[in-house]
Amino acid sequence: MKTLSISLALLVSTAAVVACDKTPPPAPQEAPASSSSSTSAQANAAAPKTTPVTISGSSALQPLVNAAKEKYEATHAGASIEVSAGGSKKGIADVASGAVQVGDSDIAAPDDVKGQLVDHKVAVVGFAAMANKGDFNAKVGALSIKDLARIFSGDVKNWKDVGGSNQPIVVINRAPASGTRAVFGNIVLGGDKFVEGQTEDNSGALVEKLKQTKGAISYLALSFANPDLVTLSLKGDAGVIDPTDANIESGNYPVWSYEHMFTKGEASGASKAFIDYILTPDFQKTVLPTVKGFIPVTEMKVTKDG
């Protein structure tokens, strides 16, 4: 019996030793995140998406705002700018009602909302009469303001009456909400009404309509000048005045306006940051001059109301 007890004790002792020697396998480890996933996560954490800055209004100003949007979003992580057209009067109405944060316009704010809005003049742009290109107006490179007024009021109906050949004139207007229409009408028509006819809601669509319509004429910001259209200079007492930057800056070419970005009250937050970016000397001197048709306000040697 004693021998049996000793044997059992030895067996238990041996089993314990064996059990102690069996080290449990290491717990499985999660695979480390890939470098690209980690970098992407860090970038997203560092650049949270912000509430978009909403802008509507002038199609004449849209090319400049789109250029600013592209540069700004590329250099300001998380920034988002949403731009739509519709005309200057729509932009003013939208910002006054709170539908958007910024209203773009070629014209000053009307008296009924002027007290609510803060004006940021971001550029100057010129306007010109532009026409469908053809043999009928090949020799018509310039018209006087008087001749333009006669065309757009409907008094002159054929290109032969202004130095061209026999071809009916088709006037295509911008819609009543257009700032381009308001600026051109105030300077050229002096308060007279445009002749009734076809209309287009935005400048881009108008360019295409002019290309397709024989004998057509309209008015556009120089930011929409197109080699497939005739851009008409002005005839003045001293000769022909081309719509160049130099002539606009000096005031020799009179058909121009300030480009406004209106906010309801003082700009703040993301909208303020975007407008401030457009007004920086760097943008005004290096980016703005590369966008066709626009001139920094600081380059103007003359001023005007509106």
Regions found by a protein language model. Name each.
Residues 1-7:
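Bacterial N-terminal signal peptides that target proteins for export
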Residues 15-19:
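C-terminal motif of bacterial Sec signal peptides marking the signal peptidase cleavage site
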